[in-house]
């Protein structure tokens, strides 16, 4: 379906000069008002470019404004005054949805999307901001969202009726269109002839405002291609098909596109991206409607990145959990180690210095408990406390040597008797009990008198070296073979016919009576001599 022709009826542009008014308090530049009238029919009093001058511009414009009864629209044009020079500023009324604004053409430079050239509520904003404020930001192309007299701005610009300001001098190379204009009616409105007079009519139109027909052929989306071309365009391509050249043209197109994309792919491998490559990509995306493919690639990459981020987050959480577990186990092991160290410290015996023994007087010790406790402390030698009564020697086994001498003295062999008056004599007031004749310890200890009350009997009975006795007045302690059945108060009998005997005081010479006690200091094991 061909697009119907768009007929634009225009009139001459008349500049109206008004008294200078300051924009702000400083009064740097003046603002003048220009009325541009657009009528459906010409009016009387035609004005030409040759006879229009600055002096009669106001009167001519006023006459044209008052004489026209079919005035449809007035376009406000501002003129800036700097010194004596006057420069006209064209303002086009534009709409976007329900919002209305003015497009300042002198500021409308290429590419125009982010250039502040739209006057909206006393503010100068960019077309992109104007589209967002109008609520049309969902549209892909801002030129389709903005309209002039109900016609999309893209169609007007593609037809050549409107172009960027000084586009032949200032171009960003991102505005080139691949549309084919077969009608030849490409007219630019961007070349004013003078500072006071700006023609708004096409080149084919007369100066009196006669209507001119302009065919606008454009397309935006691939879905609109079949319905957006004109009959002439369709006839052109059908002629190529009938001539058999369409296949060759398509093949050339394909080869050119392949080579272009191959070169583009090779160039984008080396950073940075060149400007011409960015322009090429932008044109391909816009003209072939591939913006959805770009969005699809971005969405896929974003989804992949989100999955990777979630996986990394899970792995990090697992590692943090393992670290916490290891820290907890380390704390437990440290606590157990400290506890074991404390237990070992409590179990370790503390070496204390041995207490200093003070010399004391001999005291009788009753009961065999002391002897038994001393017997258990040493296996080879047994040290017993002094003052043990003779009847309590029953707990002392035979075959041992009992003496009041220290063990260090007994280990030296024969003993030397200290002086009888020595106060430190270990035999003073004590007894020495030796083994019987059946013992293997003959002549272990010699008997020495150490006090006036100690009497040594005749040694004639002990010449064999196996019998030793000690006499202390008024008691006598005998260890003689074969005397056990004849002595009184038998305390203990041995299988070898040896007897430890206590004799009462009445049976021994001496005036005094004493309790018979024996001080036992050390004992030696029987098997050490074997």
From Swiss-Prot:
Zn(2+) binds at residues 110, 167, 171, 175. The modification Phosphoserine is found at residue 373. Keywords: Coiled coil, Cytoplasm, DNA-binding, Isopeptide bond, Metal-binding, Nucleus, Phosphoprotein, Transcription, Transcription regulation, Ubl conjugation, Zinc. There is a cross-link at residue 155 (Glycyl lysine isopeptide (Lys-Gly) (interchain with G-Cter in SUMO2)). Expressed in peripheral blood lymphocytes and fetal liver. Expressed preferentially in reproductive and/or developmentally important cells, such as testis, placenta, bone marrow and fetal tissues. Residues 304-348 form a coiled coil. InterPro entries: SAND-like_dom_sf, SAND_dom. It is found in: Nucleus; Cytoplasm. SMART domains: SAND. Residues 81-163 form the SAND domain. One of its GO terms (biological process) is transcription by RNA polymerase II. There is a cross-link at residue 155 (Glycyl lysine isopeptide (Lys-Gly) (interchain with G-Cter in SUMO1)). PROSITE patterns: SAND (PS50864). DNA binds at residues 136, 140, 143, 154. Pfam families: SAND (PF01342). One of its GO terms (molecular function) is DNA-binding transcription factor activity, RNA polymerase II-specific. One of its GO terms (cellular component) is chromatin. Homodimer, and heterodimer of GMEB1 and GMEB2. GMEB1 and GMEB2 form the parvovirus initiator complex (PIF). Interacts with the glucocorticoid receptor (NR3C1). May interact with CREB-binding protein (CBP). Trans-acting factor that binds to glucocorticoid modulatory elements (GME) present in the TAT (tyrosine aminotransferase) promoter and increases sensitivity to low concentrations of glucocorticoids. Also binds to the transferrin receptor promoter. Essential auxiliary factor for the replication of parvoviruses. This is Glucocorticoid modulatory element-binding protein 2. It comes from Homo sapiens. The lineage of its organism: Eukaryota, Metazoa, Chordata, Craniata, Vertebrata. The gene is GMEB2.
